[in-house]
């Protein structure tokens, strides 16, 4: 009886235990980032203040578009990058442009956000050709940011956590898929309008 109880407890604990994630496999080099679509939640904390929103994100080279939405689905703004640079469209339709997404974010919110690297980090890779370090706990350090990533058993990102000491950004991915081949664009939709 004593052995049956012990075996039952061990089975229960084993069933409830989460297998540790292999930190070495979180950041793997690959030739290129695959196209994807994603949806999820976004949290940003700066100077003790936090903001929350939903996002939908399409990465289909050469165009990358991130929409920031309210919990009810209204679009607060859109950020798009293509070969011609970066642009943002706010909820009122005002368009802002810069040579890079990092420069555009500095102009609009006062912080250089590593937006042009997010798709690479979400794909589980450090930016090629740039110095980086992977800490023992699986955290990537690159461009002055620490980047934590969790993935499902198939390697798809589930969370991406970025911190540069002043700013903390957390993306939680609820859906990830492939974009429709019929939706291929060569430039941001806001440039066409």
From Swiss-Prot:
This is Outer-membrane lipoprotein LolB. Belongs to the LolB family. Pfam families: LolB. The gene is lolB. Keywords: Cell outer membrane, Chaperone, Lipoprotein, Membrane, Palmitate, Protein transport, Signal, Transport. SUPFAM superfamilies: Prokaryotic lipoproteins and lipoprotein localization factors. Residues 1-15 form the signal peptide. PROSITE patterns: PROKAR_LIPOPROTEIN (PS51257). A lipid is attached at residue 16 (S-diacylglycerol cysteine). It is a lipid-anchor. The keyword Transport applies. InterPro entries: LolA/LolB/LppX, OM_lipoprot_LolB. Plays a critical role in the incorporation of lipoproteins in the outer membrane after they are released by the LolA protein. The keyword Cell membrane does not apply. Its main location: membrane. Monomer. GO terms for biological process: lipoprotein localization to outer membrane; protein transport. GO terms for cellular component: cell outer membrane. It is found in: Cell outer membrane. It comes from the Bacteria. A lipid is attached at residue 16 (N-palmitoyl cysteine). HAMAP family: LolB.
